[in-house]
Amino acid sequence: MKKQIFSTLVFAMCLILPFSVYSQEQRKKVGVVLSGGGAKGVAHIKALKVIEEAGIPIDYIVGTSMGSIVGGLYAIGYTPEQLDSMVRKQDWTFLLSDRIKRSAMSLTERERSAKYIVSLPFTKNPKAAMSGGIIKGQNLANLFSDLTMGYHDSINFNKLPIPFACVSANVVNGDQIIFHDGVLSTAMRASMAIPGVFTPVRKDSMVLVDGGIVNNYPADVAKAMGADIIIGVDVQNALKSADKLNSAPDILGQIVDLTCQTNHEKNV
């Protein structure tokens, strides 16, 4: 992770001279690309800080999965320091669950919560019970909604303080879905809906999951937006060896990472 951030710093310093020579109108446009990579995506925050300290302006920011969250929040004005503080103070055990805060529970719900460690839904409709993921992600969705206060309407992401885009995958047909507009928190949630872990986001006739499946390093999206120079932060997971594939989640994660790697090579 540190090596990746250092590489970004070196590249950033190589770019700083041209920016000091050319006027604002003449300089080339810079796009920052933040890959998916689970918890390692926190490294994106440090990379953004390095870019800022190098004095390099960011004209576009594009992300997938965790990169979409960091990128989306940065695009609306959060600083790296604010993002780092936000990450540190969160109760991630709560966020990555479907638990309800005890303060929001009724007395009956509190008693039931104290009795049972796990709660599974039983219904006559199996489709209703199988929502497509272990975690519905409502707590995360609530956090995203709180963090994007003021951007809850359907908006054009090109009109944000920094033009932004993120990637999701439509599992109905395998298409790549690029969010250039819409509700920001919904776009971020759709981009990080890891199959089998988080429930997909249903929008119109689409069923949207983690964008890493189709484009984990969307440099092509940044170029299409107008970026002449790409600063990429790649924190994609390395493939596991056979001795580390010992559970269903391990194997599912490996399948996702294999798909991500195949598509990633096209953009590097």
Predicted regions and their residues:
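Patatin-like phospholipase
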Residues: 5, 21-64, 72-268
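Bacterial N-terminal signal peptides
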Residues: 8-18
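N-terminal secretory signal peptides that target proteins for export/translocation
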Residues: 1-3
